[in-house]
Curated annotation (Swiss-Prot):
GO terms for molecular function: N-acyltransferase activity. Catalyzes the N-acylation of UDP-3-O-acylglucosamine using 3-hydroxyacyl-ACP as the acyl donor. Is involved in the biosynthesis of lipid A, a phosphorylated glycolipid that anchors the lipopolysaccharide to the outer membrane of the cell. Pathway: Bacterial outer membrane biogenesis; LPS lipid A biosynthesis. Keywords: Acyltransferase, Lipid A biosynthesis, Lipid biosynthesis, Lipid metabolism, Repeat, Transferase. This is UDP-3-O-acylglucosamine N-acyltransferase. It comes from Ectopseudomonas mendocina (strain ymp) (Pseudomonas mendocina). PROSITE patterns: HEXAPEP_TRANSFERASES (PS00101). Its EC number is 2.3.1.191.
Length: 351
């Protein structure tokens, strides 16, 4: 059953200025284009302002500036997107598991599971693992030996934690994620690869979110480290001994090579690749599909590659790129010739 709240209740939760009917009932959230009269919407991006006048939403989360041009009911806040984020949890229909261990789950005798935790069907909790208060472990999850999940954690079905993985409090991990797999470590002897045991672990801070099918490898010696408040999207690959600083966010399909250190409050857009053994300082924004091949020591935005253009124009640009080396040689030769002519002219003038 959907949750219901009055506009007055929502305004009180947000500390918002209510303009409209306090008793109006709201049953959900939706976009400006799709909202129905019983739903609340929001305007947080100027490109969607064109939909405001025609929206059927029962009320809209608006900044004071946008509220001036809107005649309907509104909750006026400083940051509509943040307000939407705060209210979204009220209408989240995600099933909540009941405390207890399912009859089909396999829990080692020496594992510790808090009575308030939930362990789903066919989950496996190995020897020495510790599960904190109000943790939810979905069906078919594996929690490896000596691994720890802090209070309030939530694992979707089919999450795998290898041995010696330390998870902080209120961590969310989506299906298919694998934490603590062996890092890619090999030594070459006369063309033959010799495996290096990966004897470190993974340590993850509090309030971290890890997306579906993301992998975080265990350290070769010391732990791979993920700081507090880090947000990792789907299908990200974090190699062994990477360090990600507090409150850094990383979008899907990024690949971070071994022993690279990423600072705090960074934003790494989708498809970014980073080579190993480099450092990225705090407060860096890396745009999508950028290849980071050296350390970044100054905050700011960084990009590589070329932006989209019509295929014909791109082919011409690519052809010119292949010609750059020859053009550079010709330019250097012309500069030499020009310098010689200039020197001769100067000598003649002096004479």
């Amino acid at each position: 059953m959907s949750a219901t709240f009055t506009l007055g209740q929502l305004a009180e939760r947000l500390g918002a200025t209510l303009r409209g009917a306090e008793a109006k009932v709201i049953t959900g959230l939706a976009t400006l284009q799709e909202a129905r009269p019983e739903q609340l919407s929001f305007l947080a991006n100027a490109q969607y302002r064109k939909f405001l006048a025609q929206t059927q939403a029962g009320a809209v989360l608006l900044s004071a500036a946008d509220a001036e041009g809107y005649a309907g009911d509104a909750l006026i806040v400083a940051n509509p997107y943040l307000a939407y984020a705060q209210l979204s949890h009220l209408f989240d229909r995600k099933p909540k598991a009941a405390p207890g261990i399912h009859a089909t789950a396999q829990v080692a005798d020496d594992a510790q599971v808090d009575p308030s935790a939930s362990v789903g069907p066919y989950a496996v909790i190995e020897s020495g693992a510790r599960i904190g208060a109000e943790v939810s472990i979905g069906a078919h999850c594996v929690v490896g030996a000596r691994s720890v999940i802090g209070d309030g954690g939530w694992l979707a079905p089919r999450v795998t934690l290898y041995h010696d993985v330390q998870i902080g409090k209120r961590v969310v991990i989506q299906s298919g994620a694998v934490i603590g797999g062996e890092g890619f470590g090999f030594a070459n002897e006369k063309g033959v690869w010799q495996k290096i045991a990966q004897i470190g672990g993974v340590t993850i801070g509090d309030d971290v979110e890890i997306g579906a099918n993301t992998t975080i490898d265990r350290g070769a010696l010391s732990d791979t480290l993920i700081g507090n408040g880090v947000k990792l999207d789907n299908q990200i690959m974090i190699a062994h001994n990477v360090q990600v600083g507090d409150n850094t966010a990383m979008a899907g399909c990024c690949g971070i090579s071994g022993s690279t250190k990423i600072g705090k409050n960074c934003m790494i857009a989708g498809g970014v690749g980073m080579v190993g053994h480099i450092e990225v300082c705090d407060n860096v924004f890396v745009t999508g599909m950028t290849m980071v091949t050296r350390s970044i020591t100054e905050p700011g935005a960084y990009s590589s590659g070329t932006a989209m253009q019509p295929a014909g124009e791109w082919k011409k640009s690519a052809a010119r790129i292949r010609q750059l080396d020859e053009m550079a040689k010709r330019l250097r030769e012309l500069e030499k010739q020009l310098a010689a002519v200039t020197q001769t002219a100067n000598v003649s003038s002096d004479a």
